[in-house]
Amino acid sequence: MMRNVQSFYFLFLLIVLNFHVVLSAVCIGQRATTTIWLNQNGDCQDVGFCQYLQNCTCWHGNLVVKSTKYYDEENFKPYFPKLREITGYLLISLCTLKFFHLFPGLTVIRGGDLILNYALVIYYNEIKEVYFPSLTAILNGGVHIGRNHRLCYVNTIRWKSIIKDIHQTGQYGIYLESNKLNCDLGCLKGHCHPAPGHDGDPKAQYCWGPGPKKQQNKAQCQRFCNTQCGPEGCLDGSDHICCHHECLGGCSAINSTNTCHACRKYRIKSTGQCVSKCPRKQYLVDKFLCQESCPYWSINSTEYHHYLWQGECVTKCPVNYISNNQTKKCEKCKSGMKCNTVCKYQDVMADGTLYNGALIRVPSDISKKGLVGCSVFEGSLTFQLQEGTGKAEDSLNELKSLKVLKGHLKIQKSSLKSLNFLSSLEVIETPQNALLHNKYVMAVYENSQLSELWPGNESIIVSDGGIFFQYNPRLCPLHIRNLQDRIHYKNGSKVTGEVSLQNNGHKVLCDTQMLVMHVEEFIPPDLNMETDMTAIECNSFKCVKVTWNFTMTSAYNNILFYAIYFKELQSNQEAVVQLDNECQNNDDWNVITVDIPKIESLEQSLFLQSKIISKLTPYTRYAFYIKEIVSKGEERSSHIHYINISQDLPSEPLGVEASFLSENKILLKWRAPSKPNGIITAFKIYYNKPDYSFWEEQKVLDWCSRDASRDKNAKDVAGYPVNKENYNQYCNISCVCDEEKENSKAIKADREAHNFNVEFQTELMRVLFTKNKFSYRNKNKSPPKIDFSKNISLILSNKILTSTSTTVTQAKIEIIEEPKVTVNGNIFSYVISGLDYFEDYELKVCGCTVVGCRRPSSTINLDCGIVQARTGVNLTADNLDSKMVRVQVQLDSYNISWIAPHKPNAVILKYEISIRYALDKDALVICRPGYLPTYIIRKSRFGNYVAKIRAISPAGNGSWTEEIHFKVAELSVTKNNNQLIIGIISAVSAVIVALLVFILLYMFLHRKLEKDVQGVLYASVNPEYMNSKEVYIPDEWELNREKIELIRELGQGSFGMVFEGIAHGIGDHAELRVAVKTTNENASIHDRIQILQEASIMKAFNCNHVVKLIGVVSQGQPTFVVMELMGRGDLKSYLKERRPDDGGIPLMRQEIYQMVAEIADGMAYLAARKFVHCDLAARNCMVASDFTVKIGDFGMARDIYERNYYRKDGKSLLPIRWMAPESLKDGIFSTASDVWSFGVVLWEICTLASQPYQGKTNEQVLNFVLSNGHLDYPEGCDYQLREFMSLCWHRDPKMRPSFLEIVHVLENEVDDDFVMVSFYHEMKRKALEDIYMKSESYIKSDAYTMSDGYTKGDGNMQNMLSRSQNRKSAIEKSKERLSISSLDSGTYVEKYDANDTPEEIPKKKKRPRSKRNSAVDSNACETKPMLRVESLYDNHDAFSENMQYGDTPVGKSDLMHPETNRELRLSEIFYGKPIPV
């Protein structure tokens, strides 16, 4: 019984365990790389293979996913959820899928094979989003994601957590380039945080997409596992429960080797179990799988035989072992037995031809191409190792076992210093057809670093051919001679050596005989099927044809071949052939070898030879010369010939950058192309919105449950890494001659990136367009093919290299895009305006030469610079119109409707409707998606309600509308009487509505008839062309239109454009520069009346610190208002120009106080004239050419001569950020409210035109100011200016200082020019003159106040007589520093002395004003000692009894603190106590 229970329990455990077991299906491709073809609908083109791959959990090999233009009627969607492991690389390119979700279960990419060091490549696709939610490990190789102009969520992945090889750094590690910029990235709120050990920021988020979506309710988070678990990974659904140590990348059950997603070492193919070593009777295959037999063990197949060696299946036996085809084993060589490890390899060259041998470009090619441990290599070996590819000698030592080479040996343009790795070479058996140039068994040439060969005295036996050593500047000829003595043919004779003693080692090249050569640019003929490949290349590239004479001489047998040398030169540079030192050598010459012609008859004595050289740089000067390479005797060469290659289309501009300037402007910058290929005549700019926008997914994404988040990682510059978490700094170390160094690091970086992209694209082309097939393809269908005869040049230019066929598929028609802007070739920036708010734009810059212009191309070869940018935010674009919000109440429900914003920021994502029941404290906020109709209908209980609405866009939240109050009435009737009551209510409502409409119409017409000029409707026969003189009476200010000449636009005014112009014959001026305000052509009559009313207001002003009116042109259209020209524009723009961060000169302290005094003086003048400005701000203050600041823009000014304040009616736009609390609350505008605005202007000056209340909406500003709030004082600003602001922002308008008082305090801070022309000093001088005249006449008077005029006292004659002499003396002293203002603001009179009388003062001679000093004062915003508050005059003693503020006399003693004996602060003078700042 117990045994049965134990058996049952064991069986139960086995069932539970097997429930978690994932059956492993390892699939092995018949080729190293297999392609998944997708048609235009995204269906599998090869259904057989896709069905086969769907059942695979591991793919042994490389996978390529790409689309084809060809279409088969299949409906098989690619989806491979079981695939968890790829042993090679994964390439996704030329794919038109929108969302790439093909491999949701892919966990590990081993990187056994790489594309230029990359294991995952996503390149040049139209994919918007990739999704690898299970990917946790890339064992070898890096990640390259580039040229995907729609792909977002690239930088929200922490690639460093996926790449496991810490040595994969720099551009060969993680390279993310030219993907979609300005993505609005945001992972699902509250999700996607990394596990411990991956990121120091616990709030960081990493995800593959926004999530959730309707199709899948997932957060799309990147999968993380606690780093303490190591590479084995975590249990599915957990980030801290570790898997078995034999696992890799994760598992589906813990403590089990059967549930691993991938194996850390080996996997048993039959069961999927992960093991550290293969069990008995199973063999290790490809260092990856354990299986019962080696693959391809077949009697009929010997090509892919595997052999057993120490429990492993190998394709070749190691050193000292020999393969036995009978036993399929590697047997150890017996003593005295000749034991060789035979290797062979067939390489593919860049042009697609096969090379019977191995081409070694990088050290890793030794192991990648199976050459490690080879003793016999059947094929040729070519070494072209470039500098910077690693320690080549260490990797090449793996070839030290090479003894027999059955091909030629070629070492060319290599960075090798020694050939010691060939020290074991004994035999070179080269077939006749394998000789290099049909002559050479060994060729070593153009190796700049090679200094020694290999040591030893052993002989080397060659079967045929000779040796060739040329242009090895560091290789001593003695070494070559020693090696040559050791090389013998099989018959014992020494090998012939074609070795030049002139160009091996440090020798100077010299010629005794000259060859005749001719060079000309080659124009290819029309293409046809008989055209050779060289001519086809010349159709796309520049070519040169080199021709020379070959003369038959007795030395014919000594000529090996001809070498054509050529190189690029500067414009007028001469070429020099020399080998002087390390930097100036012959390595900068390119060389092409040409075989000598075959002599059919000895009677021929003269031959004409030619060679076409292609791929030359257009618009470049080249030098050419040709030389004979001989085995012995003298070498002949030609003179150096020069040729200028013609122009061609330029390459793409470099450094294309875009940044927003405002809500509808983008600044586009670029640099000249790296290959201009001629003189750049123009640049054509294309821009449009991308055909895909992230916000178009608003119908799929639930924005009511998420917040819109901008990409905070995105940089302004396109094409550079944006997420520093995924990048390591790198640099290329190489020897560069001083004269070749770039002047600009940015240009050098651009060129290095360009060269790297060329290298990567070349390797990518080799992978993408290599012929490939798979055995599971449907046999009833032929693969896609192309007819080359249709368009050879198109095939070459687009690199479409596929199989040939007799069937032709219709090509996709490309829409030609027209340029939006064309600029000159010497311009490298442009401001694009008129764009939509907060929208993404794709901008392209294409260069032009005299040959033509590049155009944006849809192919992988990009011809234009491409960048993406987004415009700025319009702060009011998302605001809803409160007037358009409607509420309809129907019994127990209500309907709220509104009108969407006309031009929002990007798109409205959602609306928030706040509804509060009158008896409830909190409001209910309802979300309405932006794509739905703008209304909501809700059931409700009876009572009063308050509602408001706001719109939310990608730019943020709009302002709330005004609150709407409505009531849902209680139902008090029975259900049976509902219809009757509704009918009665409807009838009564219709009658009431009709009466209301009639009454409103009557009132509207009646008011229209009674309006005055500001609102009168003037009748006219032709109202749209109404003449201004019907509403405006010309006076002495009227000017002749013909005397006004408009020059250029200055900007937009209140009613139309503002122009700079010249007024001819105005007053004493022959020509006077003026500013001219005009109305728009389509301006209404009301606008024309308004501009004339503004001009009428200005007629009353004559102050140096108020913009002056020159005249009016009211006759005809358009109306002109001619004003004084303010050459430096408005104060706000001028302050921005002075920002040090933007290269401006900071304001000095004197300038700040001068500006403040001039503004206060101008406002004091307006206050004295009983005018309230209502819109005082830095934008409405103007700066003249001599830096004088004046008050301007009276569009809102009102005359309040008979009342002290103005209550504004209506609801027009108001400058809320500058308005006083009483203006915001009650609509009261007065001089005191202008003082509040003046304080805001002070704040603008101190912050150099920053936005007041930055970060707050208008609604928030309104509530903040009404809640006793005001602006924060600028940091580091002068203490007195801060105290001025505090005084101006007093809550009680009566407690704010007047403008004259402000100027009085600043009197000692202004320059002499201000004293001559200010309104304040003019009032002061009038008071002085009045006192002077009355003192002379002994008029009975009391003390006078000098602040705003003078007042009479008690008339004490004796006191007046006793003080008159002192007063007169003080006046005469004060007059020495005063001068009288002239009516001409541009001049002032000379100073008068004490003997001048008031009648003599105006007779003084005028002289020009001095320019203001604009020197830099770095301490302009630092705290200064307190201003000295003095009396109106310098002499305290003389006038201490005559000073007063209001009704309180102020003397010298009153200006001192009674306890500390210090000077009083401004607030202490005005209010009697300090006001805290």
Swiss-Prot record:
Keywords: ATP-binding, Glycoprotein, Kinase, Manganese, Membrane, Metal-binding, Nucleotide-binding, Phosphoprotein, Receptor, Repeat, Signal, Transferase, Transmembrane, Transmembrane helix, Tyrosine-protein kinase. Gene3D superfamilies: Hormone Receptor, Insulin-like Growth Factor Receptor 1, Chain A, domain 2 (2.10.220.10), Immunoglobulins (2.60.40.10), Phosphorylase Kinase, domain 1 (3.30.200.20), Receptor L-domain (3.80.20.20), Transferase(Phosphotransferase) domain 1 (1.10.510.10). Residues 25-980 are extracellular. ATP binds at residues 1050-1058, 1077. Residues 1356-1368 have a biased composition (Polar residues). Residues 1403-1412 have a biased composition (Basic residues). The modification Phosphotyrosine is found at residue 1201. Residues 1350-1376, 1391-1421 are annotated as: Disordered. It is a single-pass type I membrane protein. GO terms for molecular function: ATP binding; insulin receptor activity; insulin receptor substrate binding; metal ion binding; phosphatidylinositol 3-kinase binding. The keyword Transmembrane applies. SUPFAM superfamilies: Fibronectin type III, Growth factor receptor domain, L domain-like, Protein kinase-like (PK-like). The chain crosses the membrane at residues 981-1001. InterPro entries: FN3_dom (IPR003961), FN3_sf (IPR036116), Furin-like_Cys-rich_dom (IPR006211), Furin_repeat (IPR006212), Growth_fac_rcpt_cys_sf (IPR009030), Ig-like_fold (IPR013783), Kinase-like_dom_sf (IPR011009), Prot_kinase_dom (IPR000719). GO terms for biological process: glucose homeostasis; positive regulation of MAPK cascade; positive regulation of phosphatidylinositol 3-kinase/protein kinase B signal transduction. Residues 1002-1477 are cytoplasmic. One of its GO terms (cellular component) is axon. Glycans are attached at residues 55, 255, 300, 325, 457, 491, 549, 644, 732, 791, 874, 895, 957. It catalyses: L-tyrosyl-[protein] + ATP = O-phospho-L-tyrosyl-[protein] + ADP + H(+). This receptor probably binds an insulin related protein and has a tyrosine-protein kinase activity. PANTHER family: INSULIN-LIKE RECEPTOR (PTHR24416:SF525), TYROSINE-PROTEIN KINASE RECEPTOR (PTHR24416). This is Putative insulin-like peptide receptor. It comes from Hydra vulgaris. The gene is HTK7.
